């Protein structure tokens, strides 16, 4: 059988002894039924008995103490594990705790002659304390020893239970003993390396273990011997001492108790005390909280071992330490004792404000949802630094949980028990949540080496049925069960009493029946159903893919939150489910595919400023958060590359992040609230959406247009689904061979639109004299767009422009200087919006103008201009007034004292009238060209140039206007 640690022995033995030891059953009955009336609140000064197993405390009267001692003595003789302490109070026997560091790994012999010498020296200090009463008294000394030395450490206790003295007296005696040269010499002769510091000064007041009890996960100290010393105050120099005979015939739990006053062997001797100097020691409410937590929580025991694998930098360096604390806090609020224990591994930091820092950090953890790391990270760190030890601990953890069930339920295992162990095994790899239809849905974290689709690695994959768990139960779980069989057979081979051997025989028989069930399909389905409740992580589905700066890519997860972008191709705790199959590789302009695409972009969009602006705009498709309210309308007569570019963006991002949209979304009337709209739902969670191939003269629905472009929440639903609310996060492009008709004068709509007209045409036989005709290459449409190398290269280009946009323009498209698109947008608006055309041709900004126009005067001027230049029609003054208030003149309109709207700071030109000094057209010149210097192509590396009106690039020869 594999060697089991004492910790594992504790947890298994505690469960088993309740089954086959009548003495343990009787003790538990006594505590639960008869002594429960004496329970106290943790920390109460009335407490005299502490049960470490349950954490319960008692204030037992002397008669009940004797009953408890009797039961504990019977359990001790049967070898039962016990964890009882007595509180010393203000007046009790003396306990000396020696913690030895040895020169070797072997325990010192501590023969009776050595212990007798120690008795004499200890009594000298007691006598010198002047607290012994007059008369003749028998004083008993007991020595209990640690069962074995562990890594050069050893210990023993000296118990003088009958000598009742105050805590202050004990402290005085201990203080003088610490400097006793004779005691130090005796210990040094026994191979003790720290004789001057091995006596624990706190042993005067801390709770003391009752004999036969132990600290959790430690073996109990064993009685080596006892001495009886006779002291007579009339002859203080004559102190006979002899070894106690037949010591095992007494109730040793009772006799060695520091507070018992009714022993058969040990009779109390009451020492003098300075009552005024006494202060009753307090028992903290969380005393031994880590030990109790580890006893009752198998996962806490498991994490305790895992944390021990982390190297020192994890508790010395603040960033790593804070991550461990956050991980524990996010895993369970009950794991605070683990965090304290781990923090104390660095005494220097703990003793200089460490507790206060931990307190603050622990409280912060519940509020910092963006730092949602859990025990999964602790597992990863431990495996990274100590893979072999990690594997051994993990396997032993499964064994302990299963063993506890086997021993608790006499070898019979049911669905939930197996599911509990499976959860311990696979809880870091699988998660269950309930979807919007009320169904339990499984998610698996996909790791390298397992079957997967391209792009699923390092992400949470949705599973219809967790087939890996089904296989795992039959193939891997059986190995853990074999260890249980091995463990039971080991105990059957030991020289136990008949009743204990019979217990193990029945246990093995029942367990063998349970083992065969894990190969049964129906039984495994039952286990999986129970596992759903254990693996359930509420709201997990709602947290998936909510970070707009994270994209699932073919080779991991790409974070664009920092510049440069970071590829996460290892363990992480980001809840990512969606992905594109494209692998991220850093931008490299020397890559042949990247060169090909950069040259193609130069051909498709010949104007440098427009090319850069469009690439900046398209790069925002990789970000799925709220964006600037913009939509690009791309006009082109065909064979100009716009469709190739838009489709390439969509193919690179994949269906999870991009969608081709039905043009009817922009052109049809909005559906009523109760009707579904699957086309609109295609925008949910997408970073990119595009329209293409419209009919001639399509009229856009401006209310739908504003809804789709504006950042913020919208509502819609799929067929047969509930109404959903989601944010519009898509970068929108609408391409057409014909201009869209936008029948609105609303400036709020127009300022969200950008318009670009393609100039280039790709032909089979291009005109060599026309620089806007290029040689067509069918491979772009039929081969390149489908090639993974091409797609990977284009994705790197998008990421490059995203990073450039963040670094140079703070992520804001509107800051990118682009006179080409601005002038074309202005011209397009004027062709659609006659009111805007009137304003840009006839209304000028005139700061020195004294004339103030009533809004009705502006309405009249527009109506006259419209009838003269467009068409004669009847105008409705109220409608025109409202349109003017929503136009670009909005910022020039003010309220007059009589509460009417006036136009101030502007002048309305008459036909053929020119500008006066200091005046300027509102935004554009009379010919529709922006009042900025046009820019031209730089000689090299166009993608590196940053559009800036104050620093135009080095010019080449201007291209002719098509």
Swiss-Prot record:
Could you say which residues bind ATP here? 636-643
Q: Which UniProt keywords apply?
A: ATP-binding, DNA replication, Helicase, Hydrolase, Late protein, Nucleotide-binding
Superkingdom of origin organism: Viruses
Q: Where are the transmembrane segments?
A: none
Q: Name one Pfam family in it.
A: D5_N
Q: Name one GO biological process term.
A: DNA replication
Q: What induces it?
A: Expressed in the late phase of the viral replicative cycle.
Q: What is its EC number?
A: 3.6.4.-
Could you tell me which residue ranges the SF3 helicase domain spans? 607-775
Concerning its family, UniProt says:
Belongs to the asfivirus helicase C962R family.
State the name under which the record lists this protein.
Answer: Putative primase C962R
């Amino acid at each position: 059988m594999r060697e089991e640690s004492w910790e594992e022995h504790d947890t298994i033995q505690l469960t088993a002894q309740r089954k086959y030891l009548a003495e343990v059953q009787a003790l538990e009955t006594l505590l639960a039924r008869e002594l429960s009336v004496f329970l106290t609140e943790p920390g109460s000064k009335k407490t005299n008995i502490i049960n470490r197993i349950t954490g319960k405390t008692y204030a037992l009267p002397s008669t009940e103490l004797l009953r408890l001692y009797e039961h504990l003595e019977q359990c001790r003789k049967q070898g039962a594990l016990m964890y009882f302490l007595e509180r010393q109070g203000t007046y009790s026997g003396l306990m000396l705790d020696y913690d030895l560091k040895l020169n070797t790994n072997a325990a010192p012999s501590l023969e009776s002659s050595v212990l007798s010498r120690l008795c004499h020296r200890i009594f000298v200090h007691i006598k010198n304390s002047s607290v012994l009463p007059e008369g003749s008294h028998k004083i008993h000394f007991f020595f209990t020893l640690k069962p074995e030395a562990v890594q050069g450490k050893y210990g023993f206790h000296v118990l003088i239970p009958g000598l009742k003295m105050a805590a202050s007296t004990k402290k005085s005696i201990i203080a003088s003993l610490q400097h006793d040269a004779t005691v130090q010499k005796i210990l040094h002769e026994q191979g003790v390396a720290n004789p001057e510091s091995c006596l624990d000064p706190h042993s005067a007041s801390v709770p003391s273990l009752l004999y036969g009890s132990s600290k959790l996960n430690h073996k109990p100290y064993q009685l080596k011997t006892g001495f009886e010393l006779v002291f007579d105050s009339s002859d203080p120099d004559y102190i006979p001492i002899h070894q106690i005979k037949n010591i095992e015939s007494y109730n040793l739990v009772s006799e060695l108790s520091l507070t018992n006053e009714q022993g058969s062997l040990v009779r109390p001797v009451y020492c003098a005390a300075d009552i005024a100097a006494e202060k009753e020691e307090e028992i903290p409410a969380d005393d031994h909280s880590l030990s109790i937590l580890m006893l009752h929580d198998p996962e806490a025991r498991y994490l305790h071992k895992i944390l021990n694998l982390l190297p020192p930098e994890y508790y010395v360096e603040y960033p790593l330490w804070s991550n461990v604390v956050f991980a524990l806090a996010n895993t369970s609020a009950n794991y605070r004792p683990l965090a304290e224990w781990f923090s104390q591994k660095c005494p220097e930091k703990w003793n200089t404000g460490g507790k206060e820092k931990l307190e603050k950090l622990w409280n912060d953890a519940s509020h910092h949802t963006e730092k949602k790391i859990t025990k999964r990270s602790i597992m990863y760190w431990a495996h990274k630094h100590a893979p072999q030890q990690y594997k051994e601990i993990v396997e032993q953890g499964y064994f302990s949980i299963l063993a506890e069930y086997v021993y608790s339920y006499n070898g019979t295992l049911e669905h939930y028990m197996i599911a509990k162990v499976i959860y311990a095994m696979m809880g870091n790899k699988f998660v269950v949540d309930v979807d919007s239809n009320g169904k339990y849905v499984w998610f698996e974290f996909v790791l390298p080496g397992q079957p997967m689709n391209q792009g699923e690695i390092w992400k949470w994959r949705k599973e219809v049925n967790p087939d890996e768990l089904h296989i795992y139960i039959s193939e891997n779980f059986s190995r853990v069960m074999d260890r249980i069989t091995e463990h039971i057979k080991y105990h059957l081979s030991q020289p136990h009493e008949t009743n204990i051997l019979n217990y193990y025989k029945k246990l093995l028989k029942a367990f063998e029946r349970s083992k065969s069930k894990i190969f049964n399909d129906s039984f495994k389905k039952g286990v999986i159903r129970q596992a759903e409740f254990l693996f359930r992580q509420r709201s997990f589905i709602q947290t998936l893919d909510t970070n707009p700066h994270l994209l699932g890519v073919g080779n991991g997860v790409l974070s664009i939150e920092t510049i440069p972008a970071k590829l996460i191709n290892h363990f992480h705790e980001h809840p990512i489910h969606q992905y594109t199959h494209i692998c991220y590789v850093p931008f490299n302009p020397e890559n042949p595919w990247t060169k090909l695409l950069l040259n193609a972009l130069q051909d498709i969009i010949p104007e440098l400023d427009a090319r850069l602006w469009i690439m900046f705009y398209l790069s925002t498709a990789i970000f799925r958060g709220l964006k600037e309210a913009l939509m690009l309308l791309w006009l082109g007569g065909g064979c100009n590359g716009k469709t190739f570019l838009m489709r390439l963006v969509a193919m690179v991002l994949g269906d999870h992040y991009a969608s081709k949209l039905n043009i009817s979304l922009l052109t049809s009337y909005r559906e009523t609230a109760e009707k579904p709209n699957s086309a609109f739902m295609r925008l949910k969670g997408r970073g990119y959406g595009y329209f293409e191939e419209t009919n001639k003269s399509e009229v856009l629905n401006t209310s739908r247009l504003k809804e789709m472009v504006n950042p913020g929440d919208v509502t819609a639903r799929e067929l047969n689904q509930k109404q959903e609310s989601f944010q519009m996060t898509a970068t929108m492009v609408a391409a057409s061979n014909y201009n869209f008709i936008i029948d609105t004068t609303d400036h709020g709509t127009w300022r969200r639109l950008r318009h670009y007209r393609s100039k280039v045409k790709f032909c089979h036989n291009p005109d060599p004299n026309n620089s806007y005709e290029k040689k067509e290459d069918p491979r772009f449409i039929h081969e390149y767009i489908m090639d993974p190398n091409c797609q990977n290269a284009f994705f790197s280009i998008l990421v490059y422009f995203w990073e450039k946009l963040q670094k140079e323009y703070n992520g804001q498209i509107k800051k990118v200087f682009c006179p080409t698109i601005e002038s074309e947008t202005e011209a397009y608006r004027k062709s659609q919006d006659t009111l805007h055309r009137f304003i840009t041709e006839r209304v000028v900004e005139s700061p020195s103008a004294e004339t103030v126009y009533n809004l009705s005067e502006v309405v009249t001027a527009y109506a006259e201009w419209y009838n003269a230049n467009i068409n004669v029609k009847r105008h409705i003054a109220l409608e025109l007034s409202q349109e003017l208030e929503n136009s670009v003149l909005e910022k020039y309109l003010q309220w007059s004292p009589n509460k009417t709207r006036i136009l101030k700071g502007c002048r309305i030109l008459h036909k053929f009238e020119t500008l006066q000094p200091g005046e300027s057209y509102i935004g554009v010149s009379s010919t529709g060209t922006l009042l900025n210097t046009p820019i031209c192509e730089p000689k090299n590396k166009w993608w590196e140039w940053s559009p800036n009106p104050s620093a135009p690039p080095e010019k080449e020869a201007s291209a002719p206007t098509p």
